[in-house]
């Protein structure tokens, strides 16, 4: 079968393209720019067109598209005019999974990628040989966001579209549900919650939910969190640099958890994985042992030393919701308690900025100095009356040193590095380009 992927370089799409290529399908596709993922695919013999064009056409049997691609895309138009089946990446993933293998899914607003990576790591260590579809990059996976295997499927189930509700995993973790993509549910919170309820009802064996999440805590077979009623409860947590140690209780029995990744949110992510694998019949002690060797996911608290002597560091992080930013700043304070924190934040999507209103300023006010760049639209239509300047204005009203910057490149070119300072580059767009430029300009050899 010949498969055309429209938006082939995206994290979610490239994992599907990798899977298809490695099982012997004829794969090609298009994207608007080159990336590490397109380079990997090319090395496997995948033809990739840069730019979307009516002539990007090799007579496919099926066309798969990312949610960022709309019906006016010329390749979609040509496919439909020729009677070629056009499906979303959700539909395509659903078809891949529908072959009788055991399925482990992770969904929710925050922490999906790290939790999925933890789950995949543990199943690999436990000898399950999983096939993994990840919504980020983890270096332990053969292709970063994809791992071929003969065992169960492990996948990140993106809740941004109502289509996720049709999936039927055997085991599922819901990290939380905050309505981060409510615009895709017509702003209807009840519809959003009903979609979570639907996928829970379709889950064949067990569902693990966060006991403190008001939208989904009651949907789980088992729960994790700080609540006394949690199946897996956090009793105590200590830390030493990037390492942390927790005492947890599962079904009345206490255990010790050690992680090499910082932040209470990662302890909770690990607890979700422990609870799910315990429900699937794995020994808790074996899961705890596997988690000791887990390393962080790319762009999740990625630390770079800029100038060790002057104690200047850079953190690159994908955080793009207010809750994720709060966790990031809290973790930074834990790991680097004496350093000043300077944040360069790129808001992601106009709809999110509009929906969250003043929540970004509230989340960012824990930083010492904040620079807000222009919104990364992520293929959304520009909303002229919405500007990221509103975040900077909100921070100034809190008495913070904050500034809106139209040109992030110019900002870092003129930065005078301050000693004993952490520079945090935060967002889900192309802020990584700015962080990489910053590191190249300022890092001491």
From Swiss-Prot:
GO terms for molecular function: ATP binding; UDP-N-acetylmuramate-L-alanine ligase activity. GO terms for cellular component: cytoplasm. It comes from the Bacteria. Keywords: ATP-binding, Cell cycle, Cell division, Cell shape, Cell wall biogenesis/degradation, Cytoplasm, Ligase, Nucleotide-binding, Peptidoglycan synthesis. It is found in: Cytoplasm. ATP binds at residues 108-114. Coiled coil: none annotated. GO terms for biological process: cell division; cell wall organization; peptidoglycan biosynthetic process; regulation of cell shape. It catalyses: UDP-N-acetyl-alpha-D-muramate + L-alanine + ATP = UDP-N-acetyl-alpha-D-muramoyl-L-alanine + ADP + phosphate + H(+). Its EC number is 6.3.2.8. Pathway: Cell wall biogenesis; peptidoglycan biosynthesis. InterPro entries: Mur-like_cat_sf, Mur_ligase_C, Mur_ligase_C_dom_sf, Mur_ligase_cen, Mur_ligase_N, MurCDEF_pg_biosynth, UDP-N-AcMur_Ala_ligase_MurC. The keyword Cell cycle applies. Belongs to the MurCDEF family. PANTHER family: UDP-N-ACETYLMURAMATE--L-ALANINE LIGASE, UDP-N-ACETYLMURAMATE--L-ALANINE LIGASE-RELATED. Cell wall formation. This is UDP-N-acetylmuramate--L-alanine ligase.
